[in-house]
Amino acid sequence: MRHHSLTKRAQMLGATGIALAATLLLTSCGTNAADAEHDKLKVVATTTQLTDFATQVGGDDTEVTGLLPAGGSAHHFDPTPADLLALGQADVLVVNGANLESFVDSAVEASGFSGVIITAADGIDLAEAKQITAEGEDEASGTAAAADAVAHDHDHDHADEHDHDHGDEANHDHAEHADEVASETANDHDGHDHGDTNPHLWTAPRYAEGMVSEIADGFAQADPEHAANYTKRGEEYIATLTELDRWAAEQFAAVPEADRVLVSGHDSLRYFLHDYEIGFAGAILPSFEDNAEPSAAQIDALVEQIHARGVKAIFVESSMSPKLAKTIAREANVTVVDDTALYADSLGSAGSGAESYVGATVHNTRAIIEAWGGSVTDPPAAVDAAMEG
């Protein structure tokens, strides 16, 4: 920082001169403070989870701006002019990768961003993630097969497959979806291609650890002066995530295997379910995206799976409307958990208890297990401390 000495000049000046010198000194201090703020690494992160990770790693050495708000979803996000302005001024952009953020390329071009892009997904084993995705699709294949069977029945029962109303509309609120193609896959809905890997990598704490490590490494390369700080904070936060993972595993292991079956809002919790050995009976929206539309046949097949696998509750996600979940729960005669929504695509707003990644994961663990009729123990001190973000 620059220090300006005004001692000799002040001695030569009268009261007016001294006042002027004092003003110059204060102006200099103000400029120095602004310079210090300007010296911070300017970071823009796409999702709320990545914004939290970047904040945890960056600490006082960064100025982090998140593009998505609490409750926002990367599946249908459109940057505002303010978002583009922040991006254009940033030194670093942190993205998820795995084809989650379709808006990034156009946003980078429109904003004129010319900094460093850190792809958090590069910190994990994507080959393993692809395999876990495939295993999840195999597990849910019973739902897809049932949907095809239902669709086949519809073809026989209705001469015009585009006009059928799927029975009594009063008893089937989802009739409006009946003209959807039952065999529609999760990866080609609306022309979006997510590849072979479910992009919701952060839902497993051990994958979050790899993403945080990638962010810490990226910050260190972009800002070598503070590299040691980024490394230290990253290691400390990863240690907390390790404790979080261990705690969650212990909670789910205490639940009988037959009860560990879940229906989610959309296919967003694949890695969470895999790591904690939770069965997947299907999703309300059978897609990686949360703005897809299920067919009537897919809904009927999901209801059949709920009955067949003894699902106790259907969960609503914070970024989704509970309307369809309530319809399915009513048809399946099970509970819909909409008062304690799960946080998958987005973290919660301030005061929700899920405004941090750690807090959201603890919340999801507790909400799921309690809906199954179980209970959880208090998380470790380090995890509890990190829940406030």
Positions of predicted regions on the chain:
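Extracytoplasmic metal-acquisition and chelation regions
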Residues: 2-20, 25-389
